[in-house]
Structure formats: C-alpha cells, structure tokens
C-alpha cells in the first residue's frame, strides 16, 4: 500500500499542470482514500490541492474539492490547525450555486462556525424549484446533482415540508431517468429516507409512480428501480402494500422479460427487508406471515416459468437476495428455507433441459444456498423442520387444470395435507394434449402454493394395480396416505367395481370431493 500511495500522491504535487478532467478525477478519488494510510503532512498537502480548485471557480471542481474538505473534517477535532485552514478556504469563496452554498454551510457548521447569511439562503428562502431545474438538466455535472439531492433531503429533514411531496417525486424521477448510476443510487437512498415523513396517501402516490418505470420494460430505466421500490413499498400501510403485491403478480405475466425481471427483483428486495415491516406497522402475525408466503410463492412461480430468461432471473434473486442477503438474519433465512426447500429442489430438477448460461445461474444459486446451509449447521446444528403432514395423492390430475381444480387442491391442502399431483401419460377420457405441456401447465399453476407438489414423473402409479399402490405407500413411511378422487370416479371407475384384493384401492384412505350437480350427502362424513 505505501508504494501505491506514493505513486498516487505524485499526481497531486502540481495542480496547475492538470487538465480539468484529470483534476476532477483526482479530487473525487481522494475522498475514498482511507485516512489511516497517510499522516497529517499528506493530509495538509491534499487540503492545499483542494484549495487551489476551490479558488478556480469551475463549479464541478469546486464541488469535488468541497466534498473532499468535508470528508477530511470528519477525522479532525475543532481546534486542529488543519480544521482552521479548511474554514479559511471555504470562507474565502463567494459561491453562487446553491449546491456550493450548501456544502460551504455544512463545512462551517461542522467546524462550529455560524453564518446567518448562508442559513437565511438555505432555510428561509424557497430554493426547491431551482435545485429541481439543475438536477434535471443534462449539462449539469453528476457531482452537482448528487450535492443537489443531498440539499433537498437536508431541506426535508430540517422540517421544510411545503414541497415534500414534490421532492419525493423528484427523487423518484431521478431513480428512473438519470444517466449516471451514482445519481440514481443517491436519489434512491434519499427517497427511502424521505418516505417516512410523508402522509399515507403521499407515500402511495410516490410508490405507484416509481413502479411505472418497471412497466415500461426498458432495461436502462428499470435496472435500478427494484432496489428502492422494494424498500419504499414497505412504508405503505398493509392494504396499500397488498395492492402492490397484487400489481407485482400481474407484472410477472408481462411479455417483456425486462418487466418480469424487475418484478422478481422487487419481490426479492421486499422479502429481504420484510422483517422490519412488522415493527413499522403492527398487525396480526398471521397476516404478516401470509404476505411473506405469498411473496415467496411469486418467486417460486418465476422458477416454474416457461421462459428461460425468467427462470434465470428467479434463480439469481433466490440465491443472491435471499440466502446470500446481509439484511436477513440466519433465523429469517432458516424460516424461508424450511418453507420452500422442497419446492426449490423440485422446481430446479423439473426444468432439466437448460442452456449453458442457465447452468451457471443454477450453479451460482446453489452455491449461495449451500453456503447458507453450511453456516446454519456450523452455528445452530441440524435444521428443525415441522412434523410430517398427511399425504393426499391425486392419481390423475385434471386435464386441463383449471382454477376450480386448483381451488380443490388448496382446500385439501388447508385441511392439513401435503398434496401430490400425478399427471397421466395419456388418458382417452381426457383432452389429448402432449404430456409435458400438461405437466408444465400444472407445475406453473401450483408453483407458488406451498405443500402442493407435482409427483415425480419417473414413478408411474396406476390405482388399479395393487403393486403400484403398495409401492406408493412405501414412498411415505410413517405417514397417513389418502387417495383423492371425485365422487363420480368412485361410483363408476372399474377399479372400484373389481373385487377387493390385498393393497387394492378399496383398502386405501380416501378424500372424496362431490361433483357439481350431485345430490349432497345426508350428513358430513369425517376424514379418518
């Protein structure tokens, strides 16, 4: 490091010989140079380097120099000689730009020096529209825009809330349209910090407006939105948040891969920051947990998608934003893992046909999950999973799979069953549709429903064959196994009319649902 530092500091010896672009790069670089690697003498030389460009008057260089001087102040006590030199430098300047005035005021305030004229300009005059105008100009340097965002945020934090909604909307626009990544990130952070100060209706308006950037489906616009849309949505009241979740569900059906990718990333950020929502908006834990499961289910739907690009993005989000997250505690990750580990395993294996790129996406996601599992086992020992549920087996899943069929599956699941759906290879009594397409339709339909799974394709089960039923029962040892069938099947299928044999269908537990139009039973029959 000393050799590198010495080579770098050689460039700061003659500021007059530098071009404007080189000087700006050097000024911006020293802000991020760790101060423990150089002493007071070097710091003094860098302060004089910045002083030269403060005096030059070019706004871009002035702002960069002031940002460094502000950073250098952080490690200096008020009585330090270098602190006095910094104060002398900024007092000698006569800035006209509001961003330069703002930085001058901040530097003097940190040094304990009051300047009523600067305070009058910043906090007793309406300067918001002028900052808006500068921030939206293409010709404005990005470092000036960053300082402008900080100025607007400072205005709000000082209680100047006359334009607070317009300021939040301005931050939202910068996240969507700014050509500089650093401006987008600065505006996004400022937006999230500002939302808590808005009224309920204002928060909803800003979040909805920010979400419109995802609907456009343009990657250049939507790339950085999810990181802040996900955090911002968690400042909405529960009813408005549920509307946002419903909107994201609809966006997952978009024909644009960019829009779907943005929706998946937003859902990932929502899940990553979701634990804080319960403290922000107290509510019944059941409602809080139901919303978490719904969000996780939407991610799993992405894994079951028929478009490969969507499956790739879902793998990335699950691996990186959930199991590699620095925001989620190990306990939160464990709860998510216990809920979805079966779904993850099945959905990853179900889409066996893959491109080379998908192979690497899958490898990266599994590496993140494996790292989480290893850390959990080291710190907390083996996983603790809920006790096994009763098994409900659909021997021939409906074709085509409709919402009413899905409702039957969910009703049985809600009775405490783990539901397995088997898709027939071919049945003359059903629609003659290719088997893999039928299986994919069912898979996509139930991907987001927990405790509902497709039965493995390589284990054929014929309910008329006692050997198949015996093997099926052996797949679920120490668990109650139920066959699910419609009342018309029980009344008319040949296997039920055949004489009973060992392990025939007659000796199996059943869950029977009544077909529409049939007479109701004289009394309800219990599940035994």
Where do the language-model regions lie?
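Residue-level signature of the C-terminal ends
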Residues: 4-7, 11, 15, 29-40, ...
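Generic N-terminal leader segments that precede the first folded domain
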Residues: 59, 63, 90-99, 103, ...
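Short sequence/structural elements of tandem HEAT/ARM alpha-solenoid repeats
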Residues: 3-6, 39-48, 78-85, 126-127, ...
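Extended amphipathic alpha-helical coiled-coil/heptad-repeat regions
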Residues: 123, 150, 160-163, 171-243, ...
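Conserved hydrophobic register position within alpha-solenoid helical repeats
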Residues: 1, 22, 26, 46, ...
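Nucleotidyltransferase catalytic core that binds NTPs
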Residues: 226, 264, 268, 274-528
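Alpha-helix N-cap/helix-start positions at coil->helix boundaries
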Residues: 17-20, 59, 95, 111-112, ...
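Alpha-solenoid HEAT/Armadillo-like helical repeat scaffolds in large eukaryotic proteins
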Residues: 7-15, 49-56, 88-93, 101-108, ...
């Amino acid at each position: 490091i000393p050799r590198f530092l010495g080579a770098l500091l050689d460039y700061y010896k003659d500021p007059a010989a530098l071009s404007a672009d080189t000087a700006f790069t050097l000024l911006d670089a020293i802000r991020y140079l760790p101060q423990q690697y150089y002493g007071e003498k070097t710091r003094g030389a860098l302060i004089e380097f910045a002083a030269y460009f403060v005096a030059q008057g070019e706004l871009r260089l002035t702002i960069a120099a002031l940002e460094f001087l502000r950073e250098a102040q952080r490690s200096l006590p008020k009585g330090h000689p270098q602190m006095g030199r910094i104060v002398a430098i900024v007092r000698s300047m006569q800035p006209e730009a509001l961003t330069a005035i703002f930085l001058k005021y901040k530097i003097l305030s940190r040094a304990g020096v009051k300047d009523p004229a600067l305070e009058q300009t910043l906090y007793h005059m309406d300067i918001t529209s002028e900052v808006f105008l500068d921030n939206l100009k293409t010709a404005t340097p990005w470092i000036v825009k960053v300082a402008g965002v900080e100025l607007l945020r400072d205005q709000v934090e000082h209680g100047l809330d006359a334009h607070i909604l317009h300021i939040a909307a301005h931050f939202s626009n910068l996240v969507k349209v700014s050509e500089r990544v650093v401006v987008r990130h600065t505006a996004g952070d400022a937006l999230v910090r500002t939302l808590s100060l808005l009224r309920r209706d204002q928060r909803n308006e800003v979040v909805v407006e920010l979400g419109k950037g995802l609907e456009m489906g343009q990657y250049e616009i939507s790339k950085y939105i999810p990181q802040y849309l996900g955090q911002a949505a968690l400042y909405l009241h529960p009813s408005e948040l549920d509307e946002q979740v419903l909107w994201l569900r609809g966006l997952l059906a978009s024909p644009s891969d960019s829009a779907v990718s943005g929706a998946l990333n937003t859902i990932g950020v929502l899940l990553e920051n979701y634990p804080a929502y319960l403290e922000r908006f107290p509510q019944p834990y059941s409602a809080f947990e139901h919303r978490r499961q719904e969000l996780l289910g939407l991610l799993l739907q992405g894994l079951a998608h028929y478009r490969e690009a969507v499956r790739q993005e879902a793998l990335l989000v699950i691996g990186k934003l959930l199991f590699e997250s620095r925001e989620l505690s190990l306990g939160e990750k464990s709860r998510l893992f216990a809920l979805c580990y079966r779904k993850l395993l099945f959905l990853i294996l179900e889409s066996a046909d893959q491109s080379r790129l998908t192979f690497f996406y899958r490898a990266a996601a599994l590496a993140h999950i494996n790292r989480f599992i290893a850390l959990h086992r080291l710190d907390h020992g083996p996983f603790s999973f809920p006790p096994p549920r009763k098994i409900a087996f659909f021997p021939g899943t409906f074709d085509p799979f409709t919402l009413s069929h899905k409702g039957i599956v969910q009703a049985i699941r809600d009775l405490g069953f783990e539901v397995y759906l088997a898709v027939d290879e071919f049945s003359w009594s059903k629609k003659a549709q290719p088997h893999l397409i039928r299986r994919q339709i069912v898979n996509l339909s139930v991907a987001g429903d927990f405790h509902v799974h497709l039965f493995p394709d390589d284990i054929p089960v014929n309910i008329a064959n006692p050997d198949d039923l015996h093997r099926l029962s052996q797949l679920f040892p120490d668990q109650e196994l139920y066959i699910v069938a419609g009342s018309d099947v029980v009344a008319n299928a040949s296997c039920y009319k055949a004489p009973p044999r060992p392990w025939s269908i007659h000796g199996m537990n059943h869950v029977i649902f009544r077909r529409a139009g049939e007479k109701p039973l004289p009394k309800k029959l219990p599940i035994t």
